[in-house]
A protein has these predicted regions:
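Glycine-rich phosphate-binding P-loop
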Residues: 240-272
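Phosphate-binding/switch loop-helix module in NTP-utilizing enzymes
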Residues: 320-354
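Flexible beta-alpha connector loops of hexameric P-loop NTPases
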Residues: 298, 308-329, 360-376
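N-terminal accessory targeting/assembly segments
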Residues: 1-185, 189-194, 205
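Conserved NTP phosphate-binding and transfer environment spanning the P-loop NTPase/kinase superfamily
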Residues: 388-391, 397-576
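N-terminal pre-Walker A segment at the start of P-loop NTPase domains
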Residues: 206-241, 276, 284-289, 293-300, ...
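Long, charge-dense accessory insertions within large macromolecular proteins
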Residues: 164-220, 290-291, 297, 316-320, ...
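Conserved P-loop NTPase nucleotide-binding/switch module
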Residues: 340-383, 387-388, 397-428
């Protein structure tokens, strides 16, 4: 490994040369307090910035044992350090001058949720930060003096005040770690208390706006109905009270604009931990919860939707259903079956975004269209089977059909943003207004042995990133382009993820794209099932984190860990 003085000498030797001379800087350099690695150098000042990495020895960083003791605490610590580092480099970005992206210093900007990210990793041995730097130029001529400012003046100060415990706010570090431990304690107690979700008293559920996930100011704080109030004993905060939603079928009702969907949205994002001050720190949902909706036009491949749809007029086999252009009802049926395969124990649905004919059939419609002419068994007739025979609970927001009262174990009415337990009232009314129930065919767990296939359209030969020579005996390379949280292009096709409402960060999408790319290039062989491929990927993630997704030995700083449910959802939308 070279020294920082070697880097300074090289910089001065290439000053005023043509921009490609910057590539001679690739490598690692020992600074006094850390190792600086230049992993990738941009082709010109207008291209995507260069990839740079800083590695700090964990002993030198000297974080206390309570913050380093397990994966959970290290994730919370990494999140806090990354936010601090982002704030530090924000003071220096574009202070170095030049053309194009010259002087840019950027790193992942975290949202309200705490995610495992490659931008900052903490383990027992070291702390690693990955970020981007726009190497300065005048036109396309190297301006090494400006890069020297970044690497020898600005960056050392950012590292000093971001990754060394003695220079940080000890209270903030402790608070972040203790919050993570308290949040995990709630997750553990959900199972112990027979709950699928918990919403703490005084939680703030509404968000600032449709484009901001910050808490709304002057909003109505959440208050649990007494009949649903439970107490969580937390290791640091002690007793915390709030509304516990029990296993089974829960119905959320209420007038328009009274907070039904706001509560459901908070619950669907309760699969993630939130930062202090978010208002949803203790809105905690079963981590396998899956938000479902209809998706007209989605791709479905070999899914057993027979528990919901049978005897199609075209004679199509619904035990192995495939389509390039699903209807609202078939897409939602497939989503439920795929969610079961992904191990979800809780389904979240909103009547507003569901296919009406999939959810319910009223008595009048049953009279007009007899059951033998209707291939769809509505969700209303299957929700109880899903819970009693498959152990899957449901939380459903409804605003138009009263039929759902008849299957609900718990009914919560949102009244001016406050929840009211009206279960007893609803059950009494059900006796006064009975409904005609269709007798569905016997429930059977769906068949699930779907082989994963691959599409090599758009694949290119792998080349050595230094010489450009084709690499022999290596799998072809699929090009990948991420489009925010909407999806990604892989090869010549697009994977549409717009309706995965629990996919919250573009870096999760980027990671999903890389996971699919890795699977297609290394795991998919025409024999493995989707489940087997996901299990193998999960083993890799558990063993080495997202580092195994490195390309040309370079780990991107732009990945965030998705849940296994989103992995399944992504792979199920891969059109092959």
């Amino acid at each position: 490994m070279q020294s920082d003085s070697n880097l300074r000498e090289t910089l001065r030797s290439i000053d005023h040369k043509s921009y490609p001379a910057y590539k001679s800087l690739r490598g690692s350099y020992r600074f006094a307090d850390y190792v600086l690695s230049i992993d990738h150098v941009q082709g010109d000042p207008f291209a995507a910035p260069s990839h740079v990495r800083v590695t700090v020895d964990a002993k030198a960083a000297a974080f206390p044992e309570y913050a380093m003791k397990n994966t959970r605490t290290r994730t919370a610590l990494a999140d806090e350090l990354l936010r601090t580092f982002a704030a530090q480099i924000n003071h220096f970005t574009f202070k170095a001058k030049g053309s194009g992206k010259s002087g840019l210093i950027s790193v992942t900007h975290c949202g309200q949720e705490i995610l495992t990210r490659t931008a900052c990793e903490v383990n027992e041995k070291e702390i690693t930060a990955r970020f981007a730097v726009g190497f300065p130029a005048n036109g396309r001529t190297i301006n090494a003096r400006e890069l020297e400012k970044i690497l020898f003046t600005y960056l050392p100060e950012c590292v000093k005040y971001s990754f060394y415990y003695k220079n940080l706010d000890a209270r903030r570090i402790r608070d972040a770690v203790e919050l993570a431990e308290d949040q995990q304690a709630v997750r553990d107690q959900l199972k112990e208390q027979g709950l699928v979700a918990f919403v703490a008293d005084d939680a703030v559920l509404p968000r600032e706006s449709g484009i901001s996930s910050r808490p709304m100011k002057q909003s109505v704080a959440f208050t649990s109905p007494e009949s649903l109030r439970v107490t969580m004993q937390l290791p640091h905060r002690g007793a915390v009270t709030g509304m516990g939603i029990p296993k089974g079928i829960t119905l959320i009702v209420g007038g328009g604009y009274h907070g039904k969907s706001t509560l459901l949205t908070a619950l669907e994002l309760g699969v993630y931990n939130h930062i202090a001050g978010d208002g949803r720190e203790f809105v905690i949902t079963d981590e396998t919860a899956l938000k479902l909706r209809s998706e007209d036009g989605r791709f479905i491949k070999d899914v057993d939707i027979s528990m919901f749809i049978n005897d199609l007029p075209n004679g199509k086999d619904t035990h192995h259903f495939s389509t390039e252009d699903a209807s609202g009802s078939t897409s939602q049926a497939a989503g439920i079956v795929e969610g079961m395969e992904a191990g979800s124990r809780l389904f979240l649905l909103d009547e507003d975004t569901s296919a009406t004919n999939f959810m319910v059939r009223d008595a009048f419609m049953q009279k007009v269209v007899s059951p033998d002419k209707e291939p769809i068994t509505p969700f209303l007739s299957r929700a109880r089977d899903l819970y009693e025979q498959a152990g899957i609970s449901t939380i459903l927001v409804a605003g138009s059909s009263g039929a759902f009262f008849h299957i609900a174990d718990t009914v919560i009415q949102m009244d001016r943003y406050k929840p009211v337990d009206i279960t007893k009232k609803a059950k009494a009314l059900c006796k006064e207004f009975p409904i005609s129930e269709e007798k569905p065919h016997p429930f059977a767990l769906p068949h699930s042995h779907r082989i994963m296939e691959k599409d090599k359209n758009g694949a290119t030969k792998r080349r050595d990133y230094r010489s450009g020579a084709v690499r022999k005996n290596e799998p072809e390379r699929l090009k990948l382009k991420t489009m925010g949280t909407d999806g990604f292009a892989i090869g010549k096709q697009t994977v549409d993820l717009r309706y995965l409402e629990q996919l919250i960060d573009s870096e999760q999408t980027a990671c999903l794209g890389m996971l699919l790319k890795y699977a297609v290039e290394h795991l998919v062989d025409g024999k493995r099932t989707i489940a087997e491929v996901v299990v193998q990927l999960q083993k890799e993630l558990d063993t080495s984190g997202m580092r195994f997704l490195a390309e040309n030995g370079i780990v991107s700083g732009g990945y965030a860990m998705p849940r296994v449910q989103e992995m399944y959802s992504c792979f199920n939308r891969y059109r092959v």
